[in-house]
Structures are given as C-alpha cells and as structure tokens.
Amino acid sequence: MGTVDYAVEMRDITKRFPGVIASNHVNLAVRRGSIHALLGENGAGKSTLMNILTGLLRPDSGEICVRGERAALRSPAAAIALGIGMVHQHFRLVQTFTVAENITLGMSRPRFALDMAPIEREVAKLSSEYGLAVNPRAKIWQLSVGEQQRVEIIKMLYRLSLI
C-alpha cells in the first residue's frame, strides 16, 4: 500500500530492453495537487517511465500505487480508468478519425455506439474554455501540428484525468 497523500508512487521500477536498462530501480512520488516535470538527457528513461505509468509498457519489477492503492496498469484502459492520462510528445491520434472520435478512443463504450453530437459539444466547450481552438468534426489529417497537440490536451480534459 502506498501513501494516500500521493497521487502516484512508482517504487523501484525497472524496465529492460534488449541490450539496455531503460529504467533502473526508479522511485517517483507525486503529491496530490502538485506539478512535476521529468528532466533528463535523451535516453535517460523519461518516456519509458511515463509509458509504464500510462499502461503502454509493463515494468520488469517494482510497484505502482495510485492514491494509496496498489495499481496493476496492464493496459492504457486500466490507466484511464484510474484517472491517469498523458499528453504524448508523439501524437497518438488516428489520422482518418475526427477530433471527437479520437477523444473517445479507449473509453469504455465502443465508438460506433456513441452519439457524437454531445461529445462534439463538450469538446467545443472545452476548446473554448481553455483557449484551445479546434473543430471537433475536423479529421486529424486536416489539422496542423499545433492543433493536433491541442487535441491531445483536450483528450485529457475530456477524460477528467487526475494524474
């Protein structure tokens, strides 16, 4: 069990790839309501650590606690369910989908079963509220790099990510 004061704790996290140890017994604790930045040289393991936290990779050893409870982050869906989100440096967007469709990817209900109109309205509201101008009906391939970055940010706002 972790400390409830922390939004997330990563303890003794190790991740190996063939020929390299990407994360070697890393510890990270982030208090609720605080802002942290990971800094380091290329290849230092920052992205690996964040990919573990968001369920894209599994650690070889170590444990993760979210809000004081041990968490098994076996997939991005598991991380999303715990309120963990990440604005990716390399966008994880489907080019042929709309902004609104991309925002709903990975959520609990299948995309084809969703009525997109309320989602588009909410995306437009978040876009306006946070000054992140983007058209919810635009296809990703139609957007500039800056607009695609805004979609990644709006995705986390829409999902109410806590971490």
How should each PLM-predicted stretch be described?
Residues 1-163:
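Glycine-rich phosphate-binding loops of nucleotide-dependent enzymes
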